[in-house]
């Protein structure tokens, strides 16, 4: 089956260039032929159910037959192509991830390396056009930086998106940026910065110095343990609500507010003055500041059991009292 697929790919390439002289374009003509052959052979292997290992360390498998991911973009009646790319890299001094279209999800684990899974999806008017777009998308990993590059589109009938799921050590310094997509951080302790324009933010069981914002999206924050370990948390949104889940018997200095919206507190606290749009108080024995605010949206504060486990924010060599 694989031999037949590769043979078919060779025929496709030869037919495509058969009307031109073999020496057309000189060396570049031969390079174009070889690149086309490799691309068709790679996708023939993928359609045959095989994962492809690339020379730069990525492993690629086809996911075009699976359900389309509607997380960050819509498909309409367009055709799509999909592949999952994975790579494992050494733990960097700082993890720097940036993307135009797609979410970034980083999970802290008991490990010493960083495993990256990128689900790359492209859409166009035809399946072949979508597959061509996939082949143009590059993901670069160098010195802890993970950046993607692809073609620019000005019309909605063509495009692509990349959703990252990254498994990293719990002790981590990271900066995450995306334009169109959500950001999720779980079970991490360190200097963590995040920024998205169009997407929600989920923060679960974190510690250290955590700062970031979204323009269009909500904030969902779940604290763990009995206090914040580290400098504190500062998270902001312009258009979106805030949900803050605080464990019983938690100690921190809490600040939250909204311009156009209300504040709902589902547990007893002691405050001075009106809390209609702004709240600042110590809970428990006080401590580092937990700051979360929105311009347009409501704020809900709830009590619940700690979300922590082995990775809760009360531990870690980089934490501060």
Task: Annotate each predicted stretch with a short phrase.
Residues 109-111, 142, 227-228, 249:
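Short strand-connecting beta-turns/loops that link adjacent beta-strands
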């Amino acid at each position: 089956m694989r031999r037949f697929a590769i043979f078919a790919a060779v025929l496709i390439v030869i037919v495509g260039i058969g009307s031109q002289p073999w020496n057309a374009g000189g060396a570049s003509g031969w390079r174009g032929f070889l690149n086309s052959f490799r691309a068709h052979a790679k996708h023939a292997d993928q359609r045959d159910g095989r994962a492809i290992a690339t020379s730069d360390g990525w492993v690629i498998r086809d996911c075009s037959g699976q359900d389309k991911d509607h997380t960050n973009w819509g498909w309409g009646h367009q055709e799509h192509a999909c592949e999952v790319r994975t790579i494992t890299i050494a733990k960097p001094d700082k993890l720097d991830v940036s993307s135009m279209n797609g979410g970034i999800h980083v999970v802290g684990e008991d490990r010493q390396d960083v495993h990256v899974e990128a689900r790359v999806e492209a859409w166009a008017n035809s399946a072949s056009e979508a597959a061509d777009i996939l082949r143009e998308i590059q993901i670069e990993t160098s010195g802890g930086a993970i950046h993607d590059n692809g073609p620019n589109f000005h019309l909605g009938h063509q495009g692509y998106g990349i959703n990252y799921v990254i498994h990293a050590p719990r002790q981590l310094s990271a900066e995450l940026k995306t334009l169109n997509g959500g950001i999720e951080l779980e079970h991490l302790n360190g200097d963590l910065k995040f920024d998205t324009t169009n997407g929600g933010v989920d923060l679960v069981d974190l510690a250290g110095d955590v700062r970031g914002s979204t323009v269009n999206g909500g904030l969902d924050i779940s604290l763990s343990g009995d206090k914040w370990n580290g400098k504190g948390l500062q998270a902001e949104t312009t258009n979106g609500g805030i949900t803050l889940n605080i464990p019983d018997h938690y100690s921190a200095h809490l600040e939250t507010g909204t311009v156009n919206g209300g504040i709902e507190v589902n547990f007893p606290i002691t405050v001075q003055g009106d809390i209609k749009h702004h709240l600042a108080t110590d809970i428990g024995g006080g401590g580092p500041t937990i700051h979360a605010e929105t311009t347009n949206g409501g704020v809900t504060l709830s009590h619940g059991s700690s979300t922590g486990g082995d990775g809760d924010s009360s531990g870690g060599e980089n934490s501060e009292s």
